A protein has these predicted regions:
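Secondary-structure transition/hinge residues
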Residues: 1, 29-32, 133, 137
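Short acidic donor-binding loop at the edge of a beta-strand
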Residues: 1-7
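Conserved core of the sugar-phosphate nucleotidyltransferase
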Residues: 5, 14-108
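Short histidine/acidic/glycine/proline-rich micro-motifs that form metal-
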Residues: 11-15, 112-113
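Conserved alpha/beta core of the MobA/IspD/sugar-nucleotide pyrophosphorylase nucleotidyltransferase superfamily
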Residues: 76-146
Length: 146
């Protein structure tokens, strides 16, 4: 059915809570015009202050480059983190990308929205889990059964 939702729960972002997964799915189901919901965090470095590294030179990343503008005057931006993402089945079925055209944001918890790519990332995740008493089925506060 067109209402079917596909959830992406990447193993490189392990610190999700069941209620967060349900919330993201419900967000998409309740927003009929949305194609997907992406988990995002606020971006620390604004893309309008960024450059592409091209051999020995820097190339402005955007056409409206603002490297010297005060950050607080720039529009807020976010980055996709792959913590919990949801997309309507029809978007995938019809050969679109994995998000479609109308993408709704879900602000992921920055302290748990890790991306485990390197050994250092894994060590950081293990340290967090040990520090907070997290384990399989026990994410969040140590007293939380989830």
């Amino acid at each position: 059915a067109d209402e079917d939702v596909v959830l992406f729960l990447r193993p490189t972002a392990p610190f999700r809570k069941p209620e967060e997964i349900n919330h993201v799915a419900e967000m998409l189901l309740n927003q009929k015009n949305a194609d997907s919901v992406r988990s995002v965090i606020r971006t620390k470095y604004h893309p309008r202050k960024s450059y592409l590294w091209s051999e020995a030179t820097l190339v402005r990343y955007t056409s409206d480059h603002a490297a010297n503008a005060p950050s607080q005057g720039l529009e807020p931006v976010c980055s996709a983190v792959g913590f919990i993402d949801a997309v309507r089945w029809r978007v995938l079925r019809d050969g679109h990308d994995m998000e479609g055209v109308i993408i709704k944001p879900w602000l992921a918890p920055q302290d748990r929205a890790l991306d485990l790519d390197t050994e250092d990332d894994w060590q950081h995740a293990e340290d967090l889990a040990t520090q907070h008493g997290w384990g399989p089925g026990r994410i969040g506060e140590p007293s939380n059964p989830y």
